[in-house]
């Protein structure tokens, strides 16, 4: 391990002065444990278990975003219908999406989440349509509510839970009981005096520890670009994305048309400039070892995954 790695471990020990020394000792031991897991995992290709079958991540994969909401720049309608959802899903599948991530409650910064009943109403429409049309598709549900996750897996056989909250409420125990892969997102306040990647690694390792103790076997980590992070912090995180390999788990990046690109450019998220910035960011993320890119625009991003 290089000098930067050791320096960052030392810095991370000051994240909370009130935390007992033994906590940091445990943290360091976990970092070393994950480092050795990483070394051993290099002997075989990374994969996740989807309903008893290994889904390889040896080559990067494309996760298509399907927003069953009425306030998304990528997909907006006043009355969400199966036909509208299917049109988006069909386009993504035809363009080469490896998995479909369906969300029915906007989680973009500044948005007001709909209540649980409305989220489930929208999600049922989307899942019924997509599962019927594409029974073999790998489906992910984007939700921070454990109850929604349980119903999605039980009623529609959803394959993956994508949770931007970092595991609030009963999410961790629910995912453990459901036995499905879980996407863990960094979503916590940042300390301006510490390197971004150090804070993200510290947070994710603690959460992964908790998930593993509960019996969750397949975890994908998402550094959470834009969540509780400034534009500068998100860009720093992208530059240092390879640091996250110390955790030894597949990395998903959600960079698609994020404000970290369109705000500095002074353009709208729907603009061509925002799209091109997304493509270049995804290209960089893959070069730094990302296993999954989560995107609105499949066709233009798919070619990035043919070569690492």
Feature-to-residue mapping (PLM):
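Active-site-adjacent loop and "lid" segments of alpha/beta metabolic enzymes
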Residues: 50, 72-88, 107-125, 144-149, ...
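Conserved, mostly hydrophobic/aromatic
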Residues: 66, 92, 96, 161, ...
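N-terminal amphipathic alpha-helix/helix-capping segment at the start of soluble metabolic enzymes
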Residues: 43-70
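The catalytic core of metal-dependent phosphodiesterases that act on cyclic dinucleotides
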Residues: 222-223, 234
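Structural preference for beta-strand elements that scaffold enzyme active sites
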Residues: 61-65, 99-101, 138-140, 159-160, ...
């Amino acid at each position: 391990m290089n000098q930067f790695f050791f320096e960052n471990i030392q810095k991370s020990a000051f994240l909370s002065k009130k935390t007992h020394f033994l906590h940091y000792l445990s943290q360091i031991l976990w970092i070393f444990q994950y480092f050795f897991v990483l070394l051993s995992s290099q002997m075989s290709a990374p994969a996740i278990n989807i309903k008893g079958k290994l889904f390889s991540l040896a080559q990067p994969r494309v996760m298509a975003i399907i927003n069953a909401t009425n306030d998304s720049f990528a997909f907006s309608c006043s009355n969400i219908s199966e036909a509208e959802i299917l049109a988006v899903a069909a386009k993504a599948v035809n363009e080469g999406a490896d998995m479909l991530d369906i969300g029915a409650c906007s989680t973009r910064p500044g948005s007001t989440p709909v209540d649980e009943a409305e989220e489930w109403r929208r999600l049922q429409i989307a899942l019924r349509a997509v599962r019927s049309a594409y029974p073999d598709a790998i489906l992910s549900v984007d939700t921070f509510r454990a109850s929604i996750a349980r119903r999605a897996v039980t009623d529609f056989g959803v394959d993956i839970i994508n949770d931007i909250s970092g595991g609030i409420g009963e999410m961790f125990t629910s995912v453990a009981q459901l036995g499905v892969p879980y996407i863990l997102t960094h979503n916590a306040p940042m300390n301006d005096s510490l390197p971004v990647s150090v804070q993200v690694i510290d947070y994710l390792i603690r959460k992964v520890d908790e998930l593993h103790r509960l019996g969750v076997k397949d975890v994908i980590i998402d550094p959470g670009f834009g969540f509780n992070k400034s534009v500068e912090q998100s860009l720093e995180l992208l530059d240092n994305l390879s640091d996250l390999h110390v955790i030894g788990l597949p990395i998903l990046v959600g960079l698609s048309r994020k404000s970290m690109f369109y705000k500095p450019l002074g353009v709208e998220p729907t603009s061509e400039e925002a799209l091109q910035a997304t493509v270049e960011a995804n290209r960089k993320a893959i070069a730094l070892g990302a296993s999954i890119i989560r995107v609105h625009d499949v066709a233009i991003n798919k070619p990035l995954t043919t070569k690492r």
